[in-house]
Amino acid sequence: MEKSLITYSTVDGQTKIISEKIAQFATQSSVDIFPISDNIELGKYKTIIIGASIRYGKYRKEVYSFVEKNIEILDSKENAFFSVNVVARKSEKNTPETNPYLIKFLKKIKWKPKNLGVFAGKIEYPKYKFVDKYAIKFIMWITKGPTDTSKTYEFTDWKKVESFAKNLNL
C-alpha cells in the first residue's frame, strides 16, 4: 500500500485534529501524521500534505522553513496545503481564492501546491493565558466575532474537511 504524509504546524491543536480527520478518509494509502518540526524522511511518500494554522495573522516560521527546504521534493510528489484560521469562519474568506492569509502565503513562497484547502479553526478562550485571551478577544471584537472568554468556539466545517480529504484521493 502506498504511503501518504500529513505534516502540520499548530499552536493549540486544531490543525492536528483536522489532519487526523483527513487521514480517516484515506482508502488508497496508509497515512502518517507528524508535526512539521519532526525530522521526516519525505522520499518514501507518494503524497505530502501540509497543514498550518494562523496565530496573530501569521503562520509559524517552521512552515516557511519546511517549504523552502523541501520545495524540490514537494514539487515531485502529489501535494496539498491547507490553512486553518478563524477568519475563515466568514463565508467571504473561506476559500483558497478569498482567504487573505493563504493568498499572502502563496505570494511569499515559490512552491505552488497542487491542492489547496482553507478551514475555520477554533477559539478556546478558557485554555489561553491572560495576554492571548484578551488579545484574541480584542481581535474578535473588531471582527464581530465571539468575545465571551468563558467559552470555546469551534468554527471548523467538518463536511468541508471531508470533501477536501476525499478530493485528495488518499
Where do the language-model regions lie?
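Compositionally biased, disordered extreme N-termini, encompassing classical targeting presequences
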Residues: 1-2, 75
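Structured loop/turn residues at beta-strand edges in well-structured enzyme cores
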Residues: 2, 43, 111
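Short acidic low-complexity segments
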Residues: 32-43
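N-terminal beta1-alpha1 ligand-phosphate binding loop
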Residues: 2-27
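Structured loop/turn residues at secondary-structure junctions
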Residues: 10, 54-55
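Generic beta-sheet signal
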Residues: 4, 47-50
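FMN-binding flavodoxin-like domain, especially the glycine-rich phosphate-binding loop
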Residues: 25-32, 47-48, 55-170
